[in-house]
């Protein structure tokens, strides 16, 4: 399976909304396998969303995951400076783990 993530980068002002898309080359057998991560320089990836749409503990409700099948979306509402990072979708199966190529979110006024 190949995960195609778009856009590769996005620059947005504080308070705006960012939408990140992830398209799978084949249907994801179970949404339980789809997750979204946030990574900042020098830090390990942080789990934001699992099971395609479930917020991880401590993650603000401004982050929303949606989608099924081959199309998945991460939406960040009311973007804050702290949201500047690279975001990745990930599909885990019994055999392997596949990440999307990443989306760098740059927050204007950072």
Curated annotation (Swiss-Prot):
Residues 36-50 are annotated as: Framework-2. Pfam families: V-set (PF07686). Keywords: Adaptive immunity, Immunity, Immunoglobulin. InterPro entries: Ig-like_dom, Ig-like_dom_sf, Ig-like_fold, Ig_sub, Ig_V-set, IgV_Light_Chain. Residues 23-35 are annotated as: Complementarity-determining-1. Residues 99-108 are annotated as: Framework-4. Residues 58-89 are annotated as: Framework-3. Residues 51-57 are annotated as: Complementarity-determining-2. Residues 90-98 are annotated as: Complementarity-determining-3. One of its GO terms (cellular component) is immunoglobulin complex. The keyword GTP-binding does not apply. It comes from the Eukaryota. This chain was obtained from antibody to the polysaccharide of a streptococcal group a variant and was isolated from the serum of a single rabbit. This is Ig kappa chain V region K29-213.
């Amino acid at each position: 399976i190949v995960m195609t993530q778009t856009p590769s980068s996005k620059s947005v002002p504080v308070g705006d909304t960012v939408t990140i898309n992830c398209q799978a080359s084949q249907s994801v057998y179970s949404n339980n396998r789809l997750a979204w991560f946030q990574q900042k320089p020098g830090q390990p990836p942080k789990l934001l969303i699992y099971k395609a749409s479930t917020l991880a503990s401590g993650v603000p409700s401004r982050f929303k995951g949606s989608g099924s099948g081959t199309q998945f979306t991460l939406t960040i509402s009311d973007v804050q400076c702290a949201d500047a990072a690279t975001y990745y979708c990930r599909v885990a199966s019994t055999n392997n783990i596949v990440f999307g190529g990443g989306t760098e979110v740059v927050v204007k006024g950072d």
